[in-house]
A protein has these predicted regions:
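Short membrane-interface helical motifs at transmembrane helix boundaries
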Residues: 134-152
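Residue-level signature of transmembrane alpha-helical cores of multipass secondary-active transporters
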Residues: 1, 32-48, 81-84, 88, ...
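Selective transmembrane-helix segments that form parts of the transport pathway or gating/packing helices
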Residues: 124-136
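Helix-loop junctions and terminal segments of transmembrane helices
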Residues: 87-111
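Hydrophobic, small-residue-rich membrane helices and short re-entrant helix-turn-helix hairpins
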Residues: 20-33, 69-73, 102-122
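Interhelical loop/hinge segments that connect adjacent transmembrane helices in multipass membrane
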Residues: 9-44, 238-250
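Short runs within selected transmembrane alpha-helices of multi-pass transporters and secretion channels
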Residues: 1-9, 158-182, 188-204, 208, ...
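Helix-terminus/linker motif at the lipid-water interface of multi-pass membrane proteins
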Residues: 45-89, 147-149
């Protein structure tokens, strides 16, 4: 993170020096940037803190469910350190796609091109769904061999299989968040993520002492579905509003 910050600062300094050489200045640019950046930063810090609290509560909840300390940490490690990395690994392509999507949608929104916005969003969600469903099928079919090949663990394969049906929801949520950022909904998108993290803390605290790992799997499914439903609903409303404000042809 420190190296990334230094690189971004250096690139910003170079760009700023280049644009100082000529051209019109943008009034109140710093104030406008901070108006977007500060709420996002505060929301990101809040979500990170809540996620950390959730991860601290998981082993304690598993221990309260009757597991020994070693078994509780083992169960937590299998889910978070083994199964989830395998399930989420293919989504690195979608994260790159979501980042590339932001300027495309922003340009279309500023230009008032409703047709382009609809086409981009529809195409990306459709292709993401195909990719996610294919990934889920492969994970379901090869969960056992993957667990044994990568971790030499049948338990890891079992949890990969249990998490595989959640892949379409997780991957679609990634692309949906990218679309929302491109359409200027960063703050609302982050608010949904903070709500998701808060809900995760409450459910982990309430369910894990009673249901153990089964309760944690329920929390993962429930939170991902709630997050995607809220994000997708916001995306539909944002696209409709953009199209309602479409600039008439000259």
């Amino acid at each position: 993170d420190a190296v990334s910050l230094l690189m971004m600062t250096a690139m910003y300094a170079l760009d700023r020096r280049k644009y100082r050489r000529g051209g019109d200045t943008v009034p109140h640019l710093t104030r406008r940037m901070l108006a977007v950046a500060l709420p996002l930063a505060v929301s990101a810090y809040a979500r990170t803190s809540l996620t950390t609290l959730e991860h601290l509560l998981i082993p304690r909840g598993l221990k309260s469910a009757g597991l020994t300390a070693d078994r509780a940490l083992e169960g937590y490690g299998i889910v978070h350190g083994m199964a989830l990395p395998v399930v989420l690994f293919p989504s690195c392509l979608l994260y790159a796609l979501a980042d590339l999507l932001v300027p495309e949608l922003t340009t279309a929104q500023v230009s008032g091109r409703c047709g382009d916005i609809r086409r981009l969003v529809r195409t990306l969600l459709y292709r993401c769904l195909l990719f996610a469903c294919g990934t889920a099928v492969l994970l379901l079919a090869f969960s056992g061999p993957l667990g044994r090949l990568i971790y030499h663990s049948d338990d890891a394969g079992r949890f990969i299989r249990l998490l595989a049906p959640l892949v379409p929801v997780m991957y679609l949520d990634t692309v949906t968040d990218g679309c929302l950022r491109g359409l200027g909904q960063q703050t609302r998108c982050m608010a949904i993520n903070v709500l998701d993290a808060t809900l995760g803390v409450v459910l982990v605290w309430a369910l894990l002492p009673r249901f153990g790992l089964a309760g944690y799997l329920f929390v993962l499914y429930f939170n991902e579905c709630v997050n995607f439903t809220l994000s997708f609903t916001l995306l539909l409303r944002t696209v409709r509003r953009c199209c309602a404000d479409e600039k008439p042809p000259a």
